[in-house]
């Protein structure tokens, strides 16, 4: 990498067998969710509410949100704490990975054959040693407004 390239850091996470990257600047913490309170009439991807160190978080089931399913049992879920629009969220993931420093020059547009749900939540992709890392656009992932439902 040259000094002219922009480098971004990503926290990697696996959801339904797919590798995702979340901008590290948006990640507050990683934790094991406990005592989730269900919310009646909430959208199916909203798993419930959670109190984490005095903060109330809306917990999002990322498998459902992204339309990613997995046939294997992954055991106890983890959550990544993020903020969006002044609200705190916990994003349920299957596993947490490494922090990667990647050049913005190497980021590619979404492939044309990327599943629609992933494409709508993606800011692009990185190819890593035969794997595809989808870069999540957290603003799109956490947009539950009418415009998002119409898309």
Where are these regions (language model features)?
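An acidic, low-aromatic, low-complexity terminal/linker signal
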Residues: 1-151
């Amino acid at each position: 990498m040259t000094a002219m390239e922009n480098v971004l850091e990503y926290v990697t996470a696996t959801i339904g067998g797919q590798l995702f990257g979340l901008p590290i600047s948006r990640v507050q913490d990683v934790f094991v969710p406990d005592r989730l309170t269900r919310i009646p009439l909430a959208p199916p991807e909203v798993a419930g509410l959670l109190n984490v160190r005095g903060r109330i978080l809306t917990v999002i089931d990322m498998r459902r949100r992204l339309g990613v399913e997995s046939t294997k049992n992954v055991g106890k879920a983890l959550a990544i704490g993020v903020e969006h629009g002044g609200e705190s969220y916990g994003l349920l993931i299957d596993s947490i990975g490494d922090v990667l420093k990647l050049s913005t020059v190497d980021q590619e547009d979404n492939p044309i054959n990327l599943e629609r749900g992933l494409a709508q939540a993606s800011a692009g992709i990185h190819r890593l040693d035969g794997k595809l890392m989808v870069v999540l656009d957290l603003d799109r992932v956490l947009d539950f407004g009418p415009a998002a439902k119409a898309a």
